């Protein structure tokens, strides 16, 4: 056990525009309540973030925030890209235009907001796939498998 509070606050944003994204997104943070001086640390963190124009939001504990980052952010994004990969492979198999096929959902997304079109491509980088290894979930591991399958199919 440490004698000082540790604040956990994952990064949100895209690396090539990180400074802009750090200011754009709310800075979620958490510290265990049992940590010494956790209230003081939280207040100081919020004060410093607000001083540079960054909004903050505290989650109840670091575990919730870590799962939010991995499950709700990067893994969800991976699933969406996987669906784009699958739909592109199906379109290619049937020799139809991917964008034309997806135009069918444009109006639905406009009115309902629940049919976003993502663009297929190999999931690289150092967020989505590496974060899957932190969660140890067989279902989420399917993202890696589909990404590998997509890579092999596209190279043909």
Write out the residue ranges for each language-model feature.
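Internal alpha-helical scaffold of NAD(P)-dependent oxidoreductase catalytic cores
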Residues: 2-113, 141, 145-146
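C-terminal substrate-binding/catalytic lobe of Rossmann-fold NAD(P)-dependent oxidoreductases
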Residues: 97-155
């Amino acid at each position: 056990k440490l004698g000082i509070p540790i604040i956990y606050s994952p990064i949100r944003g895209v690396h090539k525009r990180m400074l802009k994204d750090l200011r754009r997104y709310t800075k979620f943070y958490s510290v265990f309540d049992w940590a010494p001086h956790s209230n003081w640390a939280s207040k100081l963190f919020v004060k410093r973030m607000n001083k540079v124009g960054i909004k903050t939001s505290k989650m109840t504990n670091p575990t919730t925030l870590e799962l939010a980052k991995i499950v709700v952010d990067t893994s969800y994004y991976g699933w969406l890209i996987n669906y784009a990969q699958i739909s592109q492979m199906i379109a290619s198999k049937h020799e139809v235009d991917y964008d034309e096929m997806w135009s069918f959902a444009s109006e639905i997304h406009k009115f309902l907001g629940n049919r976003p079109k993502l663009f297929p491509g190999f999931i690289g980088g150092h967020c989505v796939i590496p974060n899957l290894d932190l969660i140890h979930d067989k279902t989420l591991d399917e993202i890696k498998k589909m990404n590998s399958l997509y890579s092999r199919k596209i190279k043909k």
